Amino acid sequence: PNWEDWNILKTYLKEDASLLKSGTWLPLNTGDTAEPATNWSGFDGIPVGMYVGTFQSNYEGKYLAYWTLDETNSEIAETVFYLKSDTNLIESSKAGTDKKALAIRCIRK
């Protein structure tokens, strides 16, 4: 998906990430609370974590980030789509490094 696709989804869900999240989401830090995951949309966003520079297992269960296509739909965008356990906001972040591994989501139009 490109950012237009993600923005359509965000608008449809009224930016409530709980509707995308499934599985067990862990608190970011000890003593914190993880927001609920309802998956009412059927999206099945499982918190598989991500690889940033080196594998960081502390991201597992807490984050889910997807590569996003640029406006030409031919290259990876500088910004990624991500969900995290401590909020039910749908967020974006700069990709930031060449050594990054994120999830891939395909859509059928």
Summary of predicted features, one role per range:
Residues 1-109:
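Conserved positions within compact, well-structured domain cores
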